[in-house]
């Protein structure tokens, strides 16, 4: 999922600007939230949001997520797989299929 070329390009971008000093986990988490709100704003008045605008905001969210993972020294692919395993246990396919019910009500 995470291409090393993307990771290396992000690292180079940050290094060229000497921005690593600002990339604390707290600041990166805040930036994820801010960019996620901007992504949501694309859908605020129209469920059929402009794909270009959504793509730009989604890229911002993903960029900050990857930067945070890098800052924390965690592998984004592995943490997604680990979380997916936990979610599988909470939402067994035979009980959750086609339902939006929360896991504790299945």
Where are these regions (language model features)?
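Flexible "arm" and connector segments at domain edges
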Residues: 1-106
């Amino acid at each position: 999922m995470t291409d090393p070329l993307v990771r290396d390009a992000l690292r180079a971008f940050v290094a060229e600007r000497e921005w690593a000093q600002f990339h604390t986990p707290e600041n990166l988490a805040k930036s994820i939230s801010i960019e996620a709100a901007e992504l949501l704003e694309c859908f605020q008045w129209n469920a059929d949001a402009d794909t270009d605008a959504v793509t730009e905001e989604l890229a911002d969210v993903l960029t900050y997520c990857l930067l945070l993972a890098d800052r924390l020294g965690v592998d984004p692919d592995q943490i997604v797989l680990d979380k997916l395993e936990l979610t599988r246990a909470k939402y067994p396919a035979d009980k959750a299929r086609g339902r939006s019910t929360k896991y504790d009500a299945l």
